Amino acid sequence: MQAEVRRKRYRQETRSEILGAAREIFVRDGFEGFAMRTLARSVGCSLGAIYVYFTSKEELFDVLVEESFVHLFEALGILLKERGKDPVRQLKRGLRLYVEWGLKYPSEYQIAFVVRNPAKKPYRTHRAFDAARALVKLCLGRSKAAEGELELRTQALWAATHGITSLLTQRPSFPWVSKQRVIDQVIDSAVQGAIGPAKRQKSKGET
């Protein structure tokens, strides 16, 4: 029994080591520049040993992408457990958590949103995006101005938030006035643009 436990732990540790090394190589060399032999040298094992755990670089990449999104969703999970009275404030908090996660885990962020597999596959949105959409819908409420625009406004918010996250991770030496102030300005402006007009709409009978 103990021998089996040790073998299982060893397999888990080896798999994690392979994934960690693969993540850095994908970020450094891109999907097309990634080579399983390079990965084997990085881990310090034979090429055959890599294939015991993963059949191809495509499988490796898919696992890394899924792990990154799961990690991001966990970081945003606290918002899903809270039902605050101010959905706009909650939305801004979620967007800030997104940026903070990207800055704290830049390699995972690159895998999730920057490095691409050129093979054409149907794009599948993750639960993290679904959670953002739900918050935007809550902010918009029953505004007629927002009818049919939920997806547009959610995507616009993500585009702005992704933009500042990518810039901060890829241009850390740029003379930013203040990274936190820039983040706050981008998020506040994006939310005002996406939610503000809808919030100003008045229902019938309202003065």
What are these regions (language model features)?
Residues 15-16, 23, 27, 77, ...:
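Solvent-exposed, non-membrane alpha-helical residues enriched in polar/charged side chains
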Residues 77-107, 129, 147, 154-157:
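Hydrophobic alpha-helical connector segments
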Residues 64-91, 123, 132-134, 138-141:
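Amphipathic alpha-helical linker/stalk segments
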Residues 110, 114, 121-122, 126-129, ...:
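Hydrophobic/aromatic-rich alpha-helical bundle segments in the mid-to-C-terminal region
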Residues 1-13, 24, 198-207:
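N-terminal intrinsically disordered/low-complexity leader segments
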Residues 68, 72, 76, 102, ...:
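Hydrophobic recognition helices of helix-based DNA-binding modules
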Residues 17, 21, 25-59, 63:
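Helix-turn-helix
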